[in-house]
């Protein structure tokens, strides 16, 4: 999409272990239910305790009492800053009631994993909460 290439992966951690958890697409990653308003998106950004921008690479960490989610994003958050998003999409964003950061992620993440991003050893939904 307009030169924006977004790769994603996350780590789910518990007090004893941090494991790689593969998500099939951005919707699975951000929200287990359909886009039914702001509530499903606010949970991710509301609990964000760390957010850093490194050029075209960004990190978001969402935490709760039980687990942490570390999300590495390439060109997702910086798409607006680098003016990589088309004007009509920016207009929709400005008129939206949705959480700005989550909206950008949902619009710029790929719907499937890039070829070769995961090794052959990775399972489609590997990992555990323990």
Curated annotation (Swiss-Prot):
- Give an example GO biological process: symbiont-mediated suppression of host JAK-STAT cascade via inhibition of STAT2 activity
Q: Which GO terms describe its molecular function?
A: ubiquitin-like ligase-substrate adaptor activity
Q: Tell me the function of this protein.
A: Plays a role in the inhibition of host innate immunity by exploiting host DDB1-cullin RING ubiquitin ligases (CRLs). Mechanistically, recruits host DDB1 via a DCAF-like interaction motif to antagonize IFN signaling by STAT2 degradation.
Record's keyword terms, sorted: Host-virus interaction, Inhibition of host innate immune response by virus, Inhibition of host interferon signaling pathway by virus, Inhibition of host STAT2 by virus, Interferon antiviral system evasion, Viral immunoevasion
**The organism's place on the tree of life at top rank:** Viruses
The protein here is known as: Protein UL145
Subunit description: Interacts with host DDB1; this interaction promotes STAT2 degradation.
Q: Which organism is it from?
A: Human cytomegalovirus (strain Merlin) (HHV-5)
Listed under GO cellular component are: host cell nucleus
């Amino acid at each position: 999409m307009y030169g924006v290439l977004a790769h994603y992966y996350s780590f789910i951690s518990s007090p004893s272990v941090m494991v790689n958890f593969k998500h099939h697409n951005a919707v699975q990653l951000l929200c287990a239910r359909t886009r039914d308003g702001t509530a499903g998106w606010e949970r991710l950004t509301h609990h964000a305790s760390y957010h850093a921008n490194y050029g075209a690479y960004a990190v978001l960490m969402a935490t709760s009492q039980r687990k942490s989610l570390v999300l590495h994003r390439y060109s997702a958050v910086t798409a607006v800053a680098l003016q990589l998003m088309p004007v009509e999409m920016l207009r929709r964003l400005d008129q939206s009631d949705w959480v700005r950061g989550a909206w950008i992620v949902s619009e710029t993440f790929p719907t499937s994993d890039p070829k070769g991003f995961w090794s052959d050893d990775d399972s489609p939904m590997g990992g555990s909460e323990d």
